[in-house]
A protein has these predicted regions:
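Short, well-ordered alpha-helical segments enriched in acidic and aromatic residues
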Residues: 31-70, 168-196
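Acidic, serine/threonine- and glycine-rich low-complexity intrinsically disordered segments
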Residues: 131-212, 216-240, 244-249
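Short beta-strand edge/turn micro-motifs at domain boundaries
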Residues: 104-150, 247-255, 261-317
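Short, low-complexity N-terminal intrinsically disordered segments enriched in polar/charged residues
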Residues: 11-48, 122-163, 167, 175
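Bacterial Sec-dependent N-terminal signal peptides
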Residues: 1-15
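Surface-exposed, charged secondary-structure patches
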Residues: 14-15, 22, 58-116, 197-267
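Short, charged N-terminal helix-start/capping segments
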Residues: 25-33, 82-97, 181, 186-188
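Generic preference for hydrophobic/aromatic residues in regular secondary structure cores
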Residues: 17-20, 33, 37, 51, ...
C-alpha cells in the first residue's frame, strides 16, 4: 500500500483557525486536539510532499488514511471553524470541518470532514461526513441509549465506507465485506414490445432494471478495475435511513442515495447495505445492492416501493 508522507513546515497556519466550542471539559486535552487538527489542516493546504509528516498527534492508521485520500484528491481548507466535540466509544469526534475536494465537480467540491480522536487526543481517523441534516435525523430517531451508541457506530462505519471509495482503499473494502456477501447491481436495459392491436405493426419502447448477482470477490475485482481506470473517485451519500432488524437486534439495514463521480463515469442510485454487528468490533456487510435511480435521459425509473430493504432478505442463523 503506497503511502505519502507530507510536511507542513512551509504552510502558514495563521491563515486559518480551528477550535472546539463545547463537549469537552478537559482544557489541556481540548487544546491538544485543536492543535492536532490545525497541523493536519495546514498539511492539506501545503502542496509540498516529503518524508516529514506529522511526527506526533496522529496514529499510524490515520496517516495512511489521509495519505491515500490525498493521493486521489487535493483537499483545501480555508475557513475559521468551530465544532462541537462528541464523546464516542473509542474516544472523541468532531464533525463538520469544511474543505474543498479540488478534483471533484464544482457542485460536489464543498464537503465536510469527520475527525476521530483517541482518548488521549491524537487523530485516529478522518472521513468525509454525511450531511449535517441527515446526521441529525439519524441520531434523533433513537429508541434507547444502546440504539444511540449503535447508530453512532453505524454513521462512523458509513462515513468510513464512503471515504474508502474516495481513497480507493481496497484492503479496507475487502475487510468490511463478508466473505459470503451477496452483491446485487442493477442496470437499465431497453427493449421493445409489439402493439396489442394486431392490425398495427407498431413497437413501443420500454425500460426495465436488470439485476446482476455477484459474490464478494467478483465485485471487488471489478471495482479494482474501475479504480485503475479513473484518476479520481468521489462518492457522496444522501438521504441515509437506518432500520434495525425486528428479530435480530445486531442486524441493521442502511438505505441511502449514492452519487458517484469519477474521471470517466458518473451515476446516481440507491444503495442498500445489510450490516451485521454480531461482532461489534468488526461489523460486516452481508448484503449490498445498488439500483439506478434515473435513466440516461434523467427520467426517474425506480419507485420508492421497489428499493431493496431488510424485508427482502431472509436471514438464516
Amino acid at each position: 500500500m503506497a503511502c505519502l508522507l507530507l510536511a507542513a513546515q512551509h504552510c502558514v497556519a495563521s491563515d486559518f483557525d480551528f477550535s472546539i466550542s463545547d463537549g469537552i471539559s478537559n482544557s489541556k486535552l481540548k487544546e491538544k486536539m485543536e492543535k492536532n487538527v490545525i497541523s493536519m489542516l495546514s498539511i492539506f493546504n501545503s502542496r509540498e510532499i516529503s518524508m516529514n509528516f506529522m511526527k506526533k498527534g496522529i496514529t499510524e492508521d490515520a496517516k495512511i488514511c489521509i495519505s491515500e485520500l490525498l493521493q486521489n484528491t487535493t483537499i483545501k481548507y480555508s475557513s475559521v471553524t468551530s465544532s462541537s466535540c462528541i464523546k464516542t466509544i473509542s474516544g472523541y469526534q468532531v464533525r463538520g470541518v469544511p474543505v474543498n475536494l479540488e478534483s471533484a465537480d464544482y457542485e460536489e467540491a464543498g464537503q465536510n470532514l469527520t475527525i476521530d480522536f483517541t482518548p488521549d487526543g491524537d487523530i485516529s481517523n478522518v472521513s468525509i461526513s454525511i450531511e449535517k441534516k441527515t446526521y441529525s435525523q439519524i441520531m434523533n430517531d433513537v429508541s434507547s441509549q444502546d440504539d444511540y451508541l449503535r447508530r453512532q457506530q453505524i454513521v462512523s462505519f458509513v462515513e468510513q465506507f464512503r471515504t474508502a471509495y474516495n481513497r480507493k482503499d481496497m484492503p479496507f473494502l475487502n475487510s468490511v465485506y463478508s466473505d459470503d456477501a451477496l452483491i446485487i447491481t442493477g442496470r437499465v436495459v431497453n427493449y421493445f414490445i409489439r402493439s396489442k392491436n394486431a392490425d398495427e405493426n407498431i413497437f413501443m419502447h420500454k425500460e426495465k432494471i436488470e439485476y446482476n448477482r455477484q459474490n464478494k470477490f467478483q465485485y471487488l475485482n471489478s471495482l479494482q478495475k474501475v479504480f485503475r481506470r479513473n484518476e479520481f473517485v468521489n462518492v457522496k451519500f444522501e438521504d441515509v435511513d437506518i432500520v434495525q432488524h425486528p428479530k435480530y437486534d445486531d442486524i441493521y439495514g442502511v438505505t441511502l442515495k449514492q452519487r458517484w463521480f469519477s474521471t470517466h463515469y458518473s451515476d446516481e442510485g440507491y444503495l442498500f447495505l445489510m450490516i451485521d454487528f454480531s461482532d461489534s468490533e468488526r461489523p460486516l456487510i452481508q448484503v449490498r445492492t445498488w439500483q439506478p435511480y434515473k435513466n440516461n435521459k434523467g427520467d426517474i425509473i425506480l419507485q420508492d416501493n421497489d428499493i431493496f430493504s431488510l424485508s427482502d432478505f431472509h436471514i438464516v442463523r
